[in-house]
Amino acid sequence: MTISSPEREAKKVKIAVDRNPVETSFEKWAKPGHFSRTLSKGPNTTTWIWNLHADAHDFDSHTSDLEEISRKVFSAHFGQLGVIFIWLSGMYFHGARFSNYEAWLSDPVHIKPSAQVVWPVVGQEILNGDVGGGFQGIQITSGFFQLWRASGITSELQLYTTAIGGLVMAAAMFFAGWFHYHKAAPKLEWFQNVESMLNHHLAGLLGLGSLSWAGHQIHVSLPVNKLLDAGVDPKEIPLPHEFLLNRQIMQDLYPSFAKGLAPFFTLQWGEYSDFLTFNGGLNPVTGGLWLSDTAHHHLAIAVLFLVAGHMYRTNWGIGHSMREILDAHKGPFTGEGHVGLYEILTTSWHAQLAINLALFGSLSIIVAHHMYSMPPYPYLATDYGTQLSLFTHHNWIGGFCIVGAGAHAAIFMVRDYDPTNNYNNLLDRVIRHRDAIISHLNWVCIFLGFHSFGLYIHNDTMSALGRPQDMFSDTAIQLQPVFAQWIQKTHFLAPQLTAPTALSATSATWGGDVVAVGGKVAMMPISLGTSDFLVHHIHAFTIHVTVLILLKGVLFARSSRLIPDKANLGFRFPCDGPGRGGTCQVSAWDHVFLGLFWMYNSLSIAIFHFSWKMQSDVWGTVTANGVSHITGGNFAQSANTINGWLRDFLWAQSSQVIQSYGSALSAYGLMFLGAHFVWAFSLMFLFSGRGYWQELIESIIWAHSKLKVAPSIQPRALSITQGRAVGVAHYLLGGIATTWSFFLARIIAVG
C-alpha cells in the first residue's frame, strides 16, 4: 500500500452521467428487431426469427460503442434482478397462501413440506399426496421451509408481508433499469472505475450485507429458533420487533444482552459467547449447523469485507491501484506478467464475465458439497429429497456457469483481444505455447479415460467369469483411497489442536458419531473405499475432458493451423467456406456446444455417485439396533462394476418412477416418459443433415404452391449451427428432466 503523490491522484472520481440520452419509445420497443438494420425490415425467410433470438441480447452486434454496450448491460442487470425478486416473491407467496408451513414448524421431522396444491381438473388432484398435519399437496424439495425457519419466520402472515416486499423491490429494480438507461445513464468512465466498484461491492454488498444478516440472525433468528427448539408453540413466540424493543426477553434467553455494548468496546468479546459460539458440528436437535455459529461466521465475514472495502485508492490518495498491482505482477518465468490485463478487464466485459462465471460456477459446486456435509438450516439434513435436490441443482448451475465462462472467454478472444497490447504478457505466452498445453491435457484425458474405465472393464470381466476374488473391491484386491482417508482423519482430529474448545470437527462426515434427528440419520461419518476410488477417477476423467474442450475452444478461437484467419470468421460459423473440406464445426461456438455435453456427462456421474452413496452409506433410520440404510450399504459391493451401476442403481432405483402411475408421484412418471421423449427428439437435430431438410421443405412448398396456399415468408431449413443449438438444448432439457423425475420419485417414496 502506498501514499500517493499529488500528480497520481489528479484524476478525481466523480459520478458522471448523461441526462436523457435515449428517449423512451414503446413504438420502437414493440418493433421486432429494432436493434438491427437488417432484422427491422421484417422477415423474408423463416431464418429471420432465429436471427432475432440469436442477436436480441448480443449487444456487441447492435453497436460498437463501448459506452452504449455498457449501459445496455447495466440496465439489463436491473431487469434480471427484477425478475429474480418476482420469482422470490412468488416462492414466499406460495408459502403464505398454499402451504403447510405452520404445521411443518410444529413437527418438522414427521410432516413433509408442501407449498403447492393442484386443482381438481381431469383428476389431477391425485397428485395432492398426504404430507402430514392434515394437509394434502405436492411435496416440495426446494429447502425454503428450512430457510424460513432459520430466518425466524413463524407465521404465514410474515411470509405474506415478505412476498409483498419482494414485489416492491422488483418494481424498484425495473424502475432503476429504465432510469439508468433513459434518464441518467452513467458515462463509460464510471463503468471503468474499478477501485470504486471494488470498494462498494466489498464494503457495501458483501460487508454491510453480511453485517445486516448477522444482525438479523442475532436479534431475530437466534431467539426464535431457541424457543422453537425448546418446543414452544410458534403462536406463543414473540414477534420479531419485540425482541428488538424489549431487551428483557433477550436477557432471559441470552444473559450477556444485559451487559449491552460495554464488553464490545472493552474488548471482552468472550462475554458474548452465549450467542456467538464456536461449537463446530451439528445441533443435535435440528441436525443443522449451530445458528449461533453461523451468526458468528457472518459477523466475522462482515468485518473482513468491511476492511477489504477500504483497500483500493480513489479520491484520498491512499490504498491500492488495480493497474499498479497488475503491472507490477511479474515472475521470473512470466515475461511481462500481467501487463495489459488492466486494459482487457476494463474494455472487455466478455473477459470480466468469463472470469466471474468460472469463479461463480466453481463456488456453486463448492456450495453443493457443503449443503449436505454441513447442512446450514434446521431439519434440512433429515429431508432427503431436499438434500438430493440441492446437491443436484447447485452442481448443474455451476456446470452451466463454467461452460459459460469458456463461451465468453472465446468471445473475448474473437471480438475484444488486441494482439498489439499483449506482447509477451501471460496471456500471450499461454497462447504461444497452447499446443503444449492442449496436447498434454489431451494425454491426461486419454490416460485417465483408459485407466479408470479399464478398472471397471476388468471388474465386469472378472464378475462375468465368476472370479470375484480377482476383482478390485474392498473384499478382494483393495484400492483404498488412502489420501482421501488421510484428509478425513486429519480434519476429524485437527480441532483438538486448532480449536480445543469446539464441541466437534467442522463436519460430521470426517468421523465421530452418528447425528440422528427423530430417528433419521442427519449426517454421519462417510467411509470411503474401492468403489469410491474407482468413480472418483471417472470424475477426474470427465472433468478433464470438459476442460480440454473448453480450453481448446478459447486458445484456438482466433487462429489454428487448420484455419489461420479464424478470428475473421467470428465466434460462430459452420465451416471455412466452400472448397475447404474438413473445416466444419471448428468455431469457438462449436467448442461450447461440445463442452455442454461433457459438462452433462461429468455432472450426471457426480450426482449419481452422490445419490447412491448417500442412500447406501448415510441416509436411513436409527434404532436401538443401529443404523439401517436405505439400500443397505450396497454401494461398496456393486458400484465397482458397470453392470452394478446399471442393475443396482439405474434399474433398481427407477422402479419407483416407473411404477408411479395411479399414485401421488404419477406426475414424475409422466415427466420421466416425456423427458425421455424430449431427449430422443434432440437426436433428430444432432444427427441430421441440413440438405436433407432443405430438400424436404422444397417438396412441401411445391405441394403448397399447387394448392395456392404457399406462405409469403419462405421456409428454410435450420442452419447447421441452429440445428446443433436446438439439439443440445433438447438434449440437456430432456436429460435434466429425466434425472429430476427419477431422483424425486425415488427419494420421496423411500426417504
Curated annotation (Swiss-Prot):
Listed transmembrane segments? 73-96, 159-182, 198-222, 294-312, 349-372, 388-414, 436-458, 533-551, 591-612, 665-687, 725-745
Q: Where in the cell is it found?
A: Plastid, Chloroplast thylakoid membrane
Tell me a GO biological process for this protein.
Answer: photosynthesis
**Entry GO MF terms:** 4 iron, 4 sulfur cluster binding; chlorophyll binding; electron transfer activity; magnesium ion binding; oxidoreductase activity
Mainly localized where? Answer: plastid
**EC number(s) for this protein?**
1.97.1.12
Q: Which reaction does it catalyse?
A: reduced [plastocyanin] + hnu + oxidized [2Fe-2S]-[ferredoxin] = oxidized [plastocyanin] + reduced [2Fe-2S]-[ferredoxin]
Q: How does it sit in the membrane?
A: Multi-pass membrane protein
Binding-site list for [4Fe-4S] cluster: 575, 584
Record note on cofactor:
P700 is a chlorophyll a/chlorophyll a' dimer, A0 is one or more chlorophyll a, A1 is one or both phylloquinones and FX is a shared 4Fe-4S iron-sulfur center.
Name one cellular component (GO) term. chloroplast thylakoid membrane
Q: Which domain of life is it from?
A: Eukaryota
Positions binding chlorophyll a' in this chain are 676
Keywords per UniProt: 4Fe-4S, Chlorophyll, Chloroplast, Chromophore, Electron transport, Iron, Iron-sulfur, Magnesium, Membrane, Metal-binding, Oxidoreductase, Photosynthesis, Photosystem I, Plastid, Thylakoid, Transmembrane, Transmembrane helix, Transport
Which amino acid positions bind chlorophyll a, per UniProt? 684, 692
User: Which residues are noted in the entry as phylloquinone-binding?
Assistant: 693
The Swiss-Prot or TrEMBL record describes its family as follows: Belongs to the PsaA/PsaB family.
What is the annotated quaternary arrangement, including any partners? Answer: The PsaA/B heterodimer binds the P700 chlorophyll special pair and subsequent electron acceptors. PSI consists of a core antenna complex that captures photons, and an electron transfer chain that converts photonic excitation into a charge separation. The eukaryotic PSI reaction center is composed of at least 11 subunits.
Role played: PsaA and PsaB bind P700, the primary electron donor of photosystem I (PSI), as well as the electron acceptors A0, A1 and FX. PSI is a plastocyanin/cytochrome c6-ferredoxin oxidoreductase, converting photonic excitation into a charge separation, which transfers an electron from the donor P700 chlorophyll pair to the spectroscopically characterized acceptors A0, A1, FX, FA and FB in turn. Oxidized P700 is reduced on the lumenal side of the thylakoid membrane by plastocyanin or cytochrome c6.
Protein name per the record: Photosystem I P700 chlorophyll a apoprotein A1
Organism name: Tetradesmus obliquus (Green alga)
Give the source lineage, highest ranks first. Eukaryota, Viridiplantae, Chlorophyta, core chlorophytes, Chlorophyceae
